[in-house]
Amino acid sequence: MDNNSNKRMGRPHVVVIPYPAQGHVLPLISFSRYLAKQGIQITFINTEFNHNRIISSLPNSPHEDYVGDQINLVSIPDGLEDSPEERNIPGKLSESVLRFMPKKVEELIERMMAETSGGTIISCVVADQSLGWAIEVAAKFGIRRTAFCPAAAASMVLGFSIQKLIDDGLIDSDGTVRVNKTIQLSPGMPKMETDKFVWVCLKNKESQKNIFQLMLQNNNSIESTDWLLCNSVHELETAAFGLGPNIVPIGPIGWAHSLEEGSTSLGSFLPHDRDCLDWLDRQIPGSVIYVAFGSFGVMGNPQLEELAIGLELTKRPVLWVTGDQQPIKLGSDRVKVVRWAPQREVLSSGAIGCFVSHCGWNSTLEGAQNGIPFLCIPYFADQFINKAYICDVWKIGLGLERDARGVVPRLEVKKKIDEIMRDGGEYEERAMKVKEIVMKSVAKDGISCENLNKFVNWIKSQVN
């Protein structure tokens, strides 16, 4: 074998498998880009649906499956080709993923391993922590395994605490809540309401039970991994990391490259409206209310109407990202409505004074790392845990209270925004302190930075 072949065989190669929802795909793409810049070859396995959305959002992509930075995109079916609307229903999506994807991933890895005689070996599989089956597939082939948590460490600790919740009589063995109460897993952890546990928030009872059982299975799979990485910051979740000492914080992923000149939009699901950045440049610093609720459209028309009127009542400039929901009609010229925006750039622009958010973890981290106060409207999954961090632990935001209809009324919106954006406000001051904590974690001697370096060195050691 010649020297070039030896070099190819000695090149680390990581296969990355995200859960097929935008909030899970984006941090793993950011992580993949980081690894690629360290000289690691990446194969990123996406569903065909998400693969096509990402490719179509890339400007002038030179090749459909290879996007540079040593990242090769491949795709497999998700089983929802005949019922695409179920991709927006988390429970249905998870059930379909479990039925259709494991065999496809196994076949793909088997082909890749058969083709390594003249290329690179697979050093490690990095899988979303909710895909326990992917970890089991890697184990079947004797491949090193890493679980990646795109959520808060507290969310993972809740999953690890399921047996204790059963023993304490709070839930049944199928996840059904027996006692509605507020609990705290340890001092310093966010308080959690039992009727808002991650699996309980799903409306369909069968989906609740299926997801609960899947979480139990995933816990067993995670125990066999070499690494359990979390897109979080140790200093922001000290208590959670204390309860889960094997969880390794490496967040916030993507911060280092997100604002680099010439950085591609790899990871976007739709082309961004970049005109909004010019609009933000014309606004007074700290004056704009930024409104965005993630990729799952969960807000009904009555809530959209109340929110829109409440925002107009503030008489402040608003940038509203609608996502795949119906466009919002507003009469004020102070309000700019776009379908998708480059969120990291929006939040770092200096114009944003308040982030009205569903409290998805990516949005929570991105707001925190830019020192932005929040107004919180959580709906499901881990969003209630993240809201508790924002409002009760870090104290950088307020929750919006719903009325008897389950709707946040317009006057509540105006009142809370006025409180958050008051001149010399305490929320902005605390948010800037949280920003300092986040920036320290990704600095050269920060915990997240050091953990990333340790992981990269470990990957490279697999081929030496």
Curated annotation (Swiss-Prot):
Its EC number is 2.4.1.-. It is an enzyme of class 2 (transferase). The keyword Glycosyltransferase applies. UDP-alpha-D-glucose binds at residues 295, 341-343, 358-366, 380-383. GO terms for molecular function: UDP-glycosyltransferase activity. It comes from the Eukaryota. The keyword Ribonucleoprotein does not apply. Keywords: Glycosyltransferase, Transferase. PANTHER family: GLUCOSYL/GLUCURONOSYL TRANSFERASES (PTHR11926), UDP-GLYCOSYLTRANSFERASE 83A1-LIKE (PTHR11926:SF1555). Belongs to the UDP-glycosyltransferase family. This is UDP-glycosyltransferase 83A1. It comes from Arabidopsis thaliana (Mouse-ear cress). The lineage of its organism: Eukaryota, Viridiplantae, Streptophyta, Embryophyta, Tracheophyta.
